[in-house]
A protein has these predicted regions:
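Short, compositionally stereotyped local motifs that mark structural "simplifiers"
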Residues: 198, 202, 208-354, 373
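Flexible, acidic glycine-rich loops studded with aromatic residues
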Residues: 76-91, 97-248
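Active-site neighborhood of glycoside hydrolase catalytic domains
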Residues: 1-89, 96-104
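Beta-sheet entry/capping signal
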Residues: 22-25, 75-77, 90-92, 109-112, ...
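Beta-sandwich strand segments
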Residues: 188, 293-295, 442-448
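Short proline/glycine- and polar residue-rich coil/turn motifs
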Residues: 406-412
């Protein structure tokens, strides 16, 4: 409707009186097109303006808003979705869905502000042992410092259009200012140094040394900053010959001592090398700075026939949720905290998760359990279905019949059991395809966009 533009212009007129800035950010993101396809007036507008599809309708809309604001002496900024259907002539693009939108805009000689979710969304977790509820993701300070806002795909002239980068922090999970501070500091210092320093002057080693001094300044300012960088960190690694897993502990602090304790042994031992784990157990790690206990971590391992075995992914997970690669799905650690500990998930945007697991030898298999997550408000939907094939030689795979039992427990933990109908089934190799939900339908959170598929662990029993 033409009246829609009149309403927007009235609103923008008031915005302009409040904000005398050169730039006005108009958004333009996450707009599903389904309703436009059903709207007779939208379809008529497309015919009148000779627009071939709804993407061009969005571009028409953005360009009209831009023309109005340009006439007021202002310039627009929009999220990278404004590229769809054709970019408005004078628009500046904020590239948040990765860097590709920024690359495309710069190649069209448009100014760009890089703000990809990975690594400059500061509402994401900054520790694998995050004790604070977050929206998900994992952007530790070292990843922030390593960020280079000018992509290598751009030549010298195109690179001039990269104005810089911006950190974003959405506040759905931040109810009070001290939590905002916790997520902001010290990552904002890392990004500031990245953006203010010549590339050749950056030194991660030197920055780490200066963190201690920075923390003293934060203390004086009474800022509730995060010390996650110095926390005791855990990682799970494959063992030699795929026999069990290894539990690794580390901290960035040069002084102090790391110790650990296995659940079947009350003795606390000094940590020297990764701990070999070959059965279901609970391990604890301790970091002592002198005699003071600074940090404690706990890891629970659920062993089954797939734990620690060789696994391959047909297609890698999204770079926003890569976990530790395919091994994440057989590391024996099941996420019981939900999206807040998203590093334990592999996330697939619109794609299926297809894996092949080598159990090492031919063995009985009675069921396969796929652990995942459903969080529709975050566009994470249950899988459409799961396919299972088995093989003794790794080359010739056969379908296998099974019953399915699905339940949601705890923090939206999706547990799907594939119960084999033939109780005498034996195999060495399993090929498991977890089908993505697909395009999110109208009326659902994220309608019109690709659904996320989150997979945590695959059990074979």
């Amino acid at each position: 409707k033409e009246n829609t533009f009149k309403v927007l212009q009235d609103v923008l007129d008031e915005v302009l009186t409040l904000f005398p800035s050169r730039y006005i950010h108009i958004g333009g993101d996450e707009c599903p097109k389904e309703n436009w396809k059903r709207c007779a007036q939208c379809q008529q507008r497309m015919k009148d303006e000779h627009l071939k599809d709804e993407h061009e309708l969005q571009s028409y809309f953005i360009q009209r808003v831009e023309k109005y604001l340009n006439g007021k002496g202002r310039r627009i900024i929009g999220w990278d979705e404004i590229l769809e259907g054709g970019l408005a002539p004078n628009a500046t693009v904020m590239s948040w869905r990765g860097e590709q939108g920024g690359i495309d805009a710069a190649k069209q000689n448009h100014d760009v502000i890089m703000t990809p979710g990975n690594p400059v969304y500061f509402d994401h977790s900054q520790s694998t042992n995050e004790d604070s509820v977050t929206i998900g993701g994992y952007n530790p300070i070292e990843k922030v410092y390593a960020y280079e806002p000018i992509p290598k795909e751009l030549n010298e002239d195109q690179a001039k259009h990269i104005l810089g980068a911006q950190a974003n922090m959405w506040a759905e999970y931040m109810a009070y200012p001290s939590k905002v501070e916790y997520h902001l500091f010290p990552r904002i210092a890392a990004l500031s140094e990245v953006l203010w320093s010549p590339k050749e002057s950056k030194s991660w080693e030197n920055f780490q040394i200066r963190l201690n001094t920075l923390f003293k300044r934060y203390d004086l300012m009474k800022i509730n900053y995060s010390k996650a960088y110095f926390d005791l960190k855990t990682s799970v690694l494959p063992s030699a010959n795929y026999n069990g897993v290894q539990w690794k502990l580390e901290t960035k602090l040069k002084s102090g001592m790391i110790k650990y304790q296995a659940d079947d042994n009350k003795k606390i031992s000094t940590y020297l090398l990764p701990v070999k784990v070959n059965k279901s157990s609970v391990l604890k790690g301790f970091f002592y700075n002198g005699t003071k206990l600074e940090s404690v971590v706990t890891e629970k391992f659920h062993f089954n026939k797939a734990t620690g075995k060789k696994i391959t992914l047909t297609k890698a997970a999204s770079p926003n949720y890569p976990g530790d690669g395919a091994f994440t799905l057989v590391n024996g650690v099941i996420n019981e905290k939900g999206l807040g500990k998203s590093r334990e998930f592999l996330g697939f945007s619109g794609d299926d998760c297809e894996v092949e697991i080598d159990l090492g030898n031919i063995t009985d298999v009675k069921n396969v359990i796929v652990h995942g997550l459903t969080e529709k408000g975050s566009w994470i939907y249950p899988h459409k279905n799961i396919e299972l094939k088995i093989s003794n030689d790794g080359e010739n795979f056969n379908d296998v019949s099974f019953d399915v039992a699905t339940e949601i427990v705890g923090n939206q933990h999706l547990r799907t059991s594939l119960i084999l109908k033939d109780e005498k089934t034996t195999t060495r190799y399993l090929k498991i395809t977890i089908r993505n939900y697909g395009t999110i339908p109208s009326g659902m959170a994220g309608a019109g966009h690709k659904a996320w598929l989150f997979v945590d662990e695959i059990e074979v029993n």
